[in-house]
């Protein structure tokens, strides 16, 4: 079905707005994925705070022009699905990586974070970023372990001091 000029402008504006507010983006090829599977992906994306859209290459190139994701322009070939992470930089990468594992025909092309292209082979770098809560928990555990280590060293020093005095 042919899109009119106004429809194309609306799509470009919508994707551009999503790109401006996004932390990262992932580009994938969704050829061979059924409608039901795509519906499941879109549902999971909404829950994860990820914007997912299948867009024509010329329109998505126009939409990302002037954003951090302009570096992805070379990957816009063939059927293009683009996913923008709005809340966490690794959310879209994690979501699409899990989906690609379950669906053999779904292929991740590349990702972008802070204006840098991340090849599909290195998508784990982005997907494994801890969430805010996970990073906070890791920090607290490190601080807790450090204070426990200091306490143990203090007790050992007191023991050594008492042994020398005796």
UniProtKB/Swiss-Prot annotation:
Entry function: Forms part of the ribosomal stalk, playing a central role in the interaction of the ribosome with GTP-bound translation factors.
Gene Ontology terms, MF aspect: large ribosomal subunit rRNA binding; structural constituent of ribosome
Signal peptide feature range: none
Gene Ontology BP terms: translation
Entry-linked Pfam families: Ribosomal_L10
The name this protein goes by in its record: Large ribosomal subunit protein uL10
Sequence similarity: Belongs to the universal ribosomal protein uL10 family.
Keyword Membrane annotated: no
Subunit (UniProt): Part of the ribosomal stalk of the 50S ribosomal subunit. The N-terminus interacts with L11 and the large rRNA to form the base of the stalk. The C-terminus forms an elongated spine to which L12 dimers bind in a sequential fashion forming a multimeric L10(L12)X complex.
Organism per entry: Shewanella woodyi (strain ATCC 51908 / MS32)
UniProt keyword annotations, A-Z: Ribonucleoprotein, Ribosomal protein, RNA-binding, rRNA-binding
InterPro entries: Ribosomal_uL10, Ribosomal_uL10-like_sf, Ribosomal_uL10_bac, Ribosomal_uL10_bac_type, Ribosomal_uL10_CS_bac
Gene Ontology, cellular component aspect: large ribosomal subunit
């Amino acid at each position: 079905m042919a899109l009119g000029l106004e429809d194309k402008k609306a799509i470009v504006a919508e994707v551009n707005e999503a790109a401006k507010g996004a932390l990262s983006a992932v580009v994938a090829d969704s050829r061979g994925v059924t409608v039901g599977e795509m519906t499941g992906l879109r549902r999971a994306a909404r829950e994860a705070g990820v914007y997912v859209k299948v867009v024509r290459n010329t329109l998505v190139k126009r939409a990302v022009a002037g954003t951090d994701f302009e570096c992805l322009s070379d990957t816009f070939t063939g059927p293009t699905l683009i996913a923008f992470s709005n809340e966490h930089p690794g959310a879209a990468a994690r979501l699409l990586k899990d989906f690609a594992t379950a669906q053999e025909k779904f292929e991740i092309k590349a990702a972008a974070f802070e204006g840098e292209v991340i090849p599909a082979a290195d998508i784990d770098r982005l997907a494994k970023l801890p969430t805010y809560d996970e990073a906070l928990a890791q920090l607290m555990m490190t601080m807790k372990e450090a204070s426990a280590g200091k306490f143990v060293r203090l007790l050992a020093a007191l023991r050594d001091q008492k042994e020398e005095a005796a």
